[in-house]
Amino acid sequence: MKKLNEMRIEKRLTTGFRITTMITSIAAIAAVIVLLIISSRYTYALRYYGFPQGDIGRAMILFTDSRSDTRAIVGYDNQDEIDDLLSQYDDDREGFISRWEAVEDTLVTDATKSTYQTINDKLTEYWKLNEEIIESGKNVSDESSRQQAQYKAMNELAPAYEEINGLMYDLLNTKTNRGDSLDTALNIATYVLVAAAILILIISFSISVRFGR
């Protein structure tokens, strides 16, 4: 193959254009591949670590709110306020259940799935006890039942709440730690892929120079 400086001007321009186009195409393809890989991994990170952290956090807030509702229901002396709190409790409980169910689809490890199932098993008994306490303590006219409800709320429901809430924190921390690890890995992968793209450009340029001699 003739060198560029040995070709006629028309042929030289055509060959130079083709070489330049080849270099640009290789660089563009490499850049697209890098972007697709990084985009895919960040989407994965958001789905399984970023959004779940938000779902778990919001679920925990609603769980805490429902706990506060119960304490107020059995502790307040105004029946109208208690009736309003009963409605608020239902909203907070349903909101929690909805958020909590959304978390399940984002669990990817056996450990997090096991923790999630343990929490679910404990929640079944927790909600059952919670409903019993509310039923006993929601009427201000029944002082004896209210005292029993307050006793159960303090000595039975409170420890159950603390245990479940602690497990939720463990799940949240696990998600946070794994998300941080994935973020670090993505940053490293980004640097490697960018370096690879630059290397491709250098190699392509070297090839074009060789053809041009």
Question: What do these predicted ranges mean?
Answer:
Residues 77-85:
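Short secondary-structure transition hinges
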